[in-house]
Amino acid sequence: MRPMTHVPVLYQEALDLLAVRPGGVYVDATLGGAGHARGILERGGRVIGLDQDPEAVARAKGLHLPGLTVVQGNFRHLKRHLAALGVERVDGILADLGVSSFHLDDPSRGFSYQKEGPLDMRMGLEGPTAKEVVNRLPLEALARLLRELGEEPQAYRIARAIVAAREKAPIETTTQLAEIVRKAVGFRRAGHPARKTFQALRIYVNDELNALKEFLEQAAEVLAPGGRLVVIAFHSLEDRVVKRFLRESGLKVLTKKPLVPSEKEAAQNPRARSAKLRAAEKEAP
């Protein structure tokens, strides 16, 4: 496993809103490179770190950080993971919903449309791969997936191009798919033409929106009074789910408008550009 750098997005803002207190128990629900978790530990908190990716779990365990308990699992099963540790209430929960830099930088995981790799896109080890989805899904279902989960205006044209290509030979790699999309839609000013297609497939393969809804409901339940929930979303579908949940959850919303990266952070870390942070607090009954 080669070392890679992980740049936590909205690092200071997330930790400040989490309001870490020494001795408190906090959940980093998307442990990844443990960037945010380290910040919580440095402020005296104890951290339960969840990640469904076995590689991320192995990396985090290898750090041997005092006060960090690493658990492999999906955050949609938050209550189950906490129960297994004998934990009923926590003082704060943080979720960074972005694709980990480790995933994007490792071509073998199949998340990047710029680096050749197998069409996988699974965060964990379960479920269908992106390769299975693009080679098996009927035209109408594929177009709907791209339109609804990728917010892709040319969904039908891309779906048609995918179906035409797979009739000649199976679509095997990330760059193969990216080229099919590029030829179908042509040049775009705003980013790579395959960006929204890859987003849609990743969300579908990992059932991300349903997992997020389940996580948020459980997070509100396990927070102790005064405990805080901090969520960083990276696209409008995620942010919409978080915004709606916070509005309807009964939690006290701490961010009237979402926090976004400064121009300096966005320049230093282009992947942070679309991030939106929302936070809420569980009030005493």
Swiss-Prot record:
Q: What Pfam families does UniProt report for this protein, alphabetically?
A: Methyltransf_5 (PF01795)
**EC number(s) given by UniProt:** 2.1.1.199
Q: Which UniProt keywords apply?
A: Cytoplasm, Methyltransferase, rRNA processing, S-adenosyl-L-methionine, Transferase
Q: Where in the cell is it found?
A: Cytoplasm
What this protein catalyses is: cytidine(1402) in 16S rRNA + S-adenosyl-L-methionine = N(4)-methylcytidine(1402) in 16S rRNA + S-adenosyl-L-homocysteine + H(+)
List residues binding S-adenosyl-L-methionine. Answer: 34-36, 51, 75, 96, 103
A Gene Ontology biological process term? rRNA base methylation
InterPro entries, A to Z: RsmH, SAM-dep_MeTrfase_MraW_recog, SAM-dependent_MTases_sf
Metal-binding is among the record's keywords: no
Region Disordered, annotated ranges? 259-285
GO CC annotations, alphabetized: cytoplasm
Q: Which GO terms describe its molecular function?
A: rRNA (cytosine-N4-)-methyltransferase activity
**Job description of the protein:** Specifically methylates the N4 position of cytidine in position 1402 (C1402) of 16S rRNA.
Record-stated family: Belongs to the methyltransferase superfamily. RsmH family.
Stored NCBIfam families: 16S rRNA (cytosine(1402)-N(4))-methyltransferase RsmH
Return the protein name: Ribosomal RNA small subunit methyltransferase H
Species of the source:
Thermus thermophilus (strain ATCC 27634 / DSM 579 / HB8)
Gene name for this UniProt entry: rsmH
